[in-house]
Regions:
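Conserved hydrophobic positions within beta-strands
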Residues: 9-11
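Short, charged beta-turn/beta-strand-edge "cap" motif at the junction between a beta-strand
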Residues: 13, 54-59
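Short aromatic-glycine-enriched beta-strand elements
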Residues: 16-21
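Short nucleic-acid-contacting surface segments enriched for D/E, G, S/T with interspersed K/R
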Residues: 37-51
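Short, Lys/Arg- and Gly-enriched loop/turn segments at beta-strand edges
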Residues: 57-68
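Active-site metal-binding core of divalent-cation-utilizing nuclease and nuclease-like domains
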Residues: 75-82, 93, 97-143, 163-166, ...
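Nucleic-acid nuclease catalytic cores
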Residues: 149-159, 166-198, 220
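Domain-level recognition of nuclease-like catalytic cores that cleave nucleotide substrates
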Residues: 186-242
Length: 242
């Protein structure tokens, strides 16, 4: 994904989940929209370098959207969770994710399940000749980096994330593929695991989902700059203990 020209600034504060005050190079202070509703541990530190996307849409309440930040020297994190599905879909279409290659069609935000959910990506029509079932892909954005370099999800208790795992289990029971894709949006993360210390119920549900046949894949950036973000580097995933 190529970004439009972004404005670099310095983060002053993130507050009320959806707002971030940023100082631009000339000293102007602006308020940007923050799409990430999680705790954003480690990726919303005041003083960090950030990149904003401006908009000329007069209907927007906030002119700027917060897209990237620099958690440490030489690292970038894409904190705009609204881009995760598009980045994974782009990688699938380009053939960069082998486990999800060979499908004829891809649809987004399709209603499914017993709990009124929408699947992020639905891959249909096996074009490989291998006779694979349709694949329901749930995408989760990972920006929480632990001290050892592991990425962990979720960064806060998430009943919704556990619900999505239950829906994937139902999909598998019905004869389809159900796959949880951890989209690693932090260039410093080297592997992924469930954050059982933050949300033990999610970790237990993920263990149950794995035992039920749900697949898990972690993919990180092949390229991460303020001009381009390419998803598709498969990363190790450590399953929760039984």
């Amino acid at each position: 994904m190529d970004f439009p020209p972004l404005l670099e600034g310095r983060l002053l504060r993130r507050y009320k989940r959806f707002f971030a005050d940023v100082e631009l190079p000339g000293g102007e202070q602006v308020t940007a929209h923050c799409a990430n509703t999680g705790r954003m541990t480690g990726v919303c530190e005041p003083g960090s370098r950030v990149w904003l996307q401006p908009s000329d849409n007069p209907r927007r309440k906030l002119r700027y959207s917060w897209v990237l930040m620099e958690p440490a020297a030489g690292e970038l994190a894409c904190i705009d969770t609204g881009r995760a599905n598009a980045l994974v879909a782009e990688a699938i279409a380009a053939g960069r994710i082998a486990a999800l290659a060979g499908y004829a069609g891809l649809r987004r935000e399709v209603r499914y399940g017993a709990e009124g959910s929408r699947i992020d990506l639905l891959l249909e029509g096996d074009a490989s000749g291998a006779g694979r079932a349709d694949c329901y892909v749930e995408v989760k954005n990972v920006t929480l980096r632990l001290a050892d370099g592991d990425g962990a999800f979720p960064d806060a208790v998430s009943a919704r994330a556990s619900k999505h795992l239950r829906e994937l289990m139902h999909v598998v029971a019905a004869g389809h593929r159900g796959l949880l894709c951890f989209h690693v949006a932090h260039s410093g993360i080297r592997s992924v695991r469930a954050a059982g210390e933050i949300d033990p119920h999610y970790a237990a549900t993920l263990r149950e989902a794995l035992d039920s046949g749900v697949e898990v894949l972690a993919v990180g950036p092949l390229q991460a700059t303020a001009q381009r973000w390419l998803c598709g580097a498969e990363l190790p995933f450590t399953p929760p203990a039984r």
